[in-house]
């Protein structure tokens, strides 16, 4: 029977099963605290993410449910994988994943990257994106701190809490500004998998230069910086802008010509610059796709078309438009957790869990 132990981390109570020991804080986000730990069952280091107050609002409940569903569905070498999930007696949710030693943000702030590492990291990012996009998922928040790396240079994309369905009417304002695609800033709608390619291009440029390519102070300044390098958006892109205020702002900017990226990236290989040119394109319809980018000459040392898999089936987004109360999201979440642990929802464990005795159910059947 699983026992729960409590520890105070940054003033936050971590309440986890005794399977996990040696808790050490490694990161704090808007929605959760992440600690490293040792899995007593496997002897391996793991990352334990506590989702803060997952059932406090319907929005948070839905966000947590979405992240859980995605982590269960996405199984790929370059995507973080879920090894355990449980709900504590206090009804906090904990995701357990593999632990990687660092992230790309930390690497980039510590030293310049050599060419072969830039190539290998970009290859793995695009390999992961090809799979994610084939599942009908857009990450939406790709940035260096969401790209985890271990001592063998294996790379995994994490944090799918903001991920969304591929939807031509996709709305919202989500990714960290420096890596945000212009169509998100320009229209707040009608964006798709191409936003991740733009973000990957910004990350690629940062690996080449050692600093962010478009470090905007706010979204107005951000867009202005982008046009200084890439020129004024073409008319057909401007025509997609739905907001009158945004349209006025874009038209008020001075006309600018696209600058050759070779002038800015003087030390980069021509193949690297060519791929970057294809990733950082204003018109998302003309932006290179992940599968095409993997076949680009720059990534020839790593490209293997027989080992760049797509998802076997599309992710089921049928829940995403649902406007449900917290209790319903909670029951759906419990059901997913039971499914993850291969517990039959019709047996006693399922009944106890569905009736709210989640901690007891976990203790008896973990």
Curated annotation (Swiss-Prot):
Regarding how it is modified after translation, the entry says: Dually phosphorylated on Thr-171 and Tyr-173, which activates the enzyme.
Q: Position of motif TXY?
A: 171-173
What SMART domains is this protein classified in? S_TKc (SM00220)
Q: Report the GO molecular function annotations.
A: ATP binding; MAP kinase activity; protein serine kinase activity
Identify residues that carry Phosphotyrosine.
173
- What's the protein called, per UniProt? Mitogen-activated protein kinase hog1
Record's keyword terms, sorted: Activator, ATP-binding, Cytoplasm, Kinase, Nucleotide-binding, Nucleus, Phosphoprotein, Serine/threonine-protein kinase, Transcription, Transcription regulation, Transferase
State the SUPFAM superfamilies in the record: Protein kinase-like (PK-like)
Question: Chief location of this protein?
Answer: cytoplasm
GO cellular component, alphabetical, reads: cytoplasm; nucleus
Q: Which Gene3D superfamilies match?
A: Phosphorylase Kinase, domain 1, Transferase(Phosphotransferase) domain 1
**Name of one Pfam family that matches:** Pkinase
The record ties this protein, via CDD domains, to: STKc_Sty1_Hog1
